[in-house]
């Protein structure tokens, strides 16, 4: 026998124990999960990255929405500025319109000498009203309509058989709106039921 083939009992035991240890080492990874701390850290960083991306996405959406709101508000402000830029000017024209109407009411229409003057005042008033209507100025001065506190100012209440209660009976001073916004309420007498 050669020296390789002859094993002492001690050598055989040590070889067997080495083989058992090798088999146990191979079996160990299958039964016990060894967690690498680097894998845990990677998972934590991936979760943090996902949260940061979500926060960034949310803030981008919020910023876009805010920009859209600012744009829409500024468009509305510009539109209102264009629409109501003439409000003060129209308000200053109202006394002129009132005076022309008073001149027509007080004029002696029977006097033939004043006929051309009266006609001139009528044409002037008509052209002025046509011009301001083009820019959205409307007259509030109808009678026999329901009293509307948004455009009428009740100066007095009168008993009437001819009118239903809360109807405009008489307009003392015409009111005006500019593009739907009240510039001056119509001063009116409102009907009430007889007591």
From Swiss-Prot:
Protein name per UniProt: Protein GrpE
- Tell me the protein family, please: Belongs to the GrpE family.
Please give the GO cellular component terms listed in this UniProt entry: cytosol
Q: Which GO terms describe its molecular function?
A: adenyl-nucleotide exchange factor activity; protein homodimerization activity; protein-folding chaperone binding; unfolded protein binding
Please indicate if the UniProt record lists Zinc as a keyword: no
Which PROSITE patterns does this chain map to? GRPE
Q: What GO biological process terms does the UniProt entry carry, in alphabetical order? A: protein folding
Q: Where is this region: Disordered?
A: 1-40
Enumerate the Pfam families for this protein.
Answer: GrpE
Q: How does it assemble?
A: Homodimer.
The family database entries (HAMAP family) matched by this protein are listed as: GrpE
Places the protein is found: Cytoplasm
Carries keyword Thylakoid? no
Quote the biased-composition stretches of kind Polar residues, using this chain's numbering.
1-24
InterPro entries linked = GrpE (IPR000740), GrpE_coiled_coil (IPR013805), GrpE_head (IPR009012)
* Residue ranges that the Swiss-Prot or TrEMBL entry lists as coiled coil: none
Source species: Sodalis glossinidius (strain morsitans)
- This protein's UniProt keywords: Chaperone, Cytoplasm, Stress response
Its annotated function is as follows: Participates actively in the response to hyperosmotic and heat shock by preventing the aggregation of stress-denatured proteins, in association with DnaK and GrpE. It is the nucleotide exchange factor for DnaK and may function as a thermosensor. Unfolded proteins bind initially to DnaJ; upon interaction with the DnaJ-bound protein, DnaK hydrolyzes its bound ATP, resulting in the formation of a stable complex. GrpE releases ADP from DnaK; ATP binding to DnaK triggers the release of the substrate protein, thus completing the reaction cycle.
């Amino acid at each position: 026998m050669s020296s390789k083939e002859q094993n002492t009992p001690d050598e055989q035991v040590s070889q067997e124990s080495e083989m058992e240890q090798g088999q146990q080492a191979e079996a160990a990874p299958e039964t016990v999960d060894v967690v690498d701390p680097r894998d845990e850290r990677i998972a934590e960083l991936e979760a943090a990255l996902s949260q940061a991306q979500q926060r960034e996405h949310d803030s981008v959406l919020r910023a876009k929405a805010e920009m859209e709101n600012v744009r829409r508000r500024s468009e509305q402000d510009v539109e209102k500025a264009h629409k109501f830029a003439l409000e003060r000017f129209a308000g200053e024209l109202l006394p002129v319109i009132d005076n022309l109407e008073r001149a027509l009411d007080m004029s002696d229409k029977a006097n033939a000498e004043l006929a051309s003057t009266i006609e001139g005042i009528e044409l002037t008033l008509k052209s002025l009203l046509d011009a301001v209507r083009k820019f959205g100025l409307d007259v509030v001065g109808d009678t026999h309509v329901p009293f509307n506190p948004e455009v009428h100012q009740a100066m007095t209440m009168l008993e009437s058989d001819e009118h239903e209660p809360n109807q405009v009976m008489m307009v003392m001073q015409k009111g005006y709106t500019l593009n739907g916004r009240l510039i001056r309420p119509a001063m009116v007498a409102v009907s009430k039921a007889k007591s």
